[in-house]
Amino acid sequence: MSRSKKTRRISDIMPARKADKKPALPISNSKKRKPTRYELDVQAREEKKKRKHKGLPTGSRNVITEQKTASAKVKKDPRVGSRKKVPLMVEFVNKPEKGQMIKPVPLEPSNHATKATVSPEVELTQLENNECLNQLLDQLEAGKVLSTQDQQFVDECLDRVHELIIELGIEDDEENNEDLLLRQFETIDINKFK
C-alpha cells in the first residue's frame, strides 16, 4: 500500500490570530476617549512596517545609470565632430582640391652640376661601400632571383663602376695575376722538379 503524506493546515492546529488579520483602524477621537492598548499596538505595527520599507528597491543604482545613459545618447550636440571625410591614403592628401592648383617649382640646373663635380675616386669608393648594392650582390651570389628594379639598380651600378675604372685607368690585378699564373703553369718544365 502506498504511503500518503499527511498535511496539516495552520487553521487545524490553532485559530487565526488577531495579529494575522488586518484590522480596520478605528477612528479615535482624542477628546472623547483614550485609545486602547490594542489600537496602540496596531498603530505601532503599521508605523514600524512603513519605517522598515523606507529604502529604495534593490538594484536602483543600475536602473538609474541606464536611464542616465539613455538620456545622454538622446541629447547629442550636433556641433561636435566634422562631416568632412578624412582621406585614408596619402595620395589623396596630395591631390589639390577643385580650383586650387599648386604651381610646379622648376628644377635648378645647378643641382646636376654639383653631382658632376664629385671626383671619380670618391664616386668609386662610394659605390664600393654602398651597403644596398653589396647586399644585392650577396643575394645574387647565393643564387636568389632579384626583382626587376633591383636587377636594374645592380646593372647600373656595375656599369658605372666599370666606367670609373676605365676612366681612372685602374686595371684588375686579379685577372692579370691569373693570366700570369696560367702561363707559368703551362710553361713549367716538370722534369726540373724530379
From Swiss-Prot:
Oligomeric and partner information: Interacts with Der.
The UniProt keywords, alphabetically, are: GTPase activation, Ribosome biogenesis
Keyword Phosphoprotein carried by entry: no
* Gene from which the chain derives: yihI
**Has keyword Magnesium?**
no
- Annotated signal sequence is none
Q: Name one Pfam family in it.
A: YihI
State any single GO MF term.
GTPase activator activity
Protein's UniProt name: Der GTPase-activating protein YihI
Basic and acidic residues bias located where?
9-23, 36-47
List the biased-composition ranges (Polar residues). 59-70
- Entries under InterPro entries matching the protein: YihI
Q: Which domain of life is it from?
A: Bacteria
Q: Which GO terms describe its biological process?
A: ribosome biogenesis
